[in-house]
């Protein structure tokens, strides 16, 4: 057991009663093939991988399937409703995924605009209400809006997934204060979704005290996805440890790091 493992041995990401050691979640899109997806997942140390039902053949056993490469006993396969633009589409997609896989978890995405891929909060909320009633563990992709985040918790969502920046933008964290407000507003896990561009974007997010971070494009479009996966693994750990350790206060003026008492020639 490494030093960081000892420090985090009792620290878990817990969603709907299920515990995960890793706070990094991987998206499965954009990789060149399923083999690379598997290698990146293993290198990242992640225990959850999201799967776009419309884009990966998890519902068609006659075609090559991501589940042929990833053991669902070892990882949580998290179907998502990427590509849906209405609550009705998202509900049907989630139902189809559950029927095909037996998985009742869903990362709920209802997109409001094709150019920005920002979420349609009204449609997402409508879909979430139905899916929660149907027995799903719902993790909605949302704006970094603390008011809406609380509404999603109130209807029974198991976590909320606010964006750091638009999907695939790689811009990194744009509004830390809203994420802090969301963390204060809800008691369910807050998992930052979208906008991560590199491993260096992760520690500032994790230091806010959020519970986890999801990334895909930053891995798939890296020059070396495996190395980036390893970097993100340790960036997530570093950010979490920094949050738990507690940073020093920021000050306007300098404070000497060495004692001045007894310094020669100092009056």
Curated annotation (Swiss-Prot):
It catalyses: [ThiS sulfur-carrier protein]-C-terminal-Gly-aminoethanethioate + 2-iminoacetate + 1-deoxy-D-xylulose 5-phosphate = [ThiS sulfur-carrier protein]-C-terminal Gly-Gly + 2-[(2R,5Z)-2-carboxy-4-methylthiazol-5(2H)-ylidene]ethyl phosphate + 2 H2O + H(+). SUPFAM superfamilies: ThiG-like. Pathway: Cofactor biosynthesis; thiamine diphosphate biosynthesis. InterPro entries: Aldolase_TIM, Thiazole_synthase_ThiG, ThiG. It holds the Pfam family ThiG. Coiled coil: none annotated. It is found in: Cytoplasm. The active site is at 107 (schiff-base intermediate with dxp). It is an enzyme of class 2 (transferase). GO terms for biological process: thiamine biosynthetic process; thiamine diphosphate biosynthetic process. One of its GO terms (molecular function) is thiazole synthase activity. The keyword Transferase applies. Its EC number is 2.8.1.10. The keyword Transferase applies. It comes from the Bacteria. 1-deoxy-D-xylulose 5-phosphate binds at residues 168, 194-195, 216-217. Belongs to the ThiG family. PANTHER family: THIAZOLE SYNTHASE (PTHR34266:SF2). Catalyzes the rearrangement of 1-deoxy-D-xylulose 5-phosphate (DXP) to produce the thiazole phosphate moiety of thiamine. Sulfur is provided by the thiocarboxylate moiety of the carrier protein ThiS. In vitro, sulfur can be provided by H(2)S. Homotetramer. Forms heterodimers with either ThiH or ThiS. This is Thiazole synthase. It comes from Aquifex aeolicus (strain VF5).
């Amino acid at each position: 057991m490494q030093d960081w493992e000892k420090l985090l041995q009792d620290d878990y990401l817990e969603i709907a009663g299920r515990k995960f050691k890793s706070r990094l979640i991987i998206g499965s899109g954009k990789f060149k093939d399923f083999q690379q997806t598997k290698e990146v997942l293993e290198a990242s140390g992640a225990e959850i991988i999201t799967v776009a039902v419309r884009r990966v053949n998890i519902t068609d056993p006659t075609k090559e399937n991501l589940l042929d490469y990833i053991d669902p006993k070892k990882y949580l396969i998290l179907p998502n409703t990427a590509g849906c633009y209405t609550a009705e589409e998202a509900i049907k997609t989630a139902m189809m995924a559950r029927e095909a896989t037996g998985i009742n978890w869903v990362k709920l995405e209802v997109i409001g605009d094709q150019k920005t891929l920002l979420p349609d909060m009204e449609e997402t909320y409508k879909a979430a209400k139905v899916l929660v009633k149907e027995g799903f563990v719902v993790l909605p992709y949302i704006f970094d809006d603390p008011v809406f985040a609380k509404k999603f918790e109130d209807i029974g969502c198991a976590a909320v997934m606010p964006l750091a920046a638009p999907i695939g933008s790689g811009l990194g964290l744009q509004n830390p204060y809203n994420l802090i407000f969301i963390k204060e507003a809800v008691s369910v896990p807050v998992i930052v979704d979208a906008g991560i561009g590199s491993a260096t974007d992760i520690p500032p997010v994790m230091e806010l005290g959020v519970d986890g971070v999801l990334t895909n494009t930053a891995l798939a479009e890296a020059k070396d996805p495996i190395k980036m996966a390893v970097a993100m693994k340790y960036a997530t750990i570093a950010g979490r440890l920094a949050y738990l350790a507690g940073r020093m206060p920021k000050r306007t003026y300098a404070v000497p790091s060495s004692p001045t008492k007894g310094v020669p020639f100092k009056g």
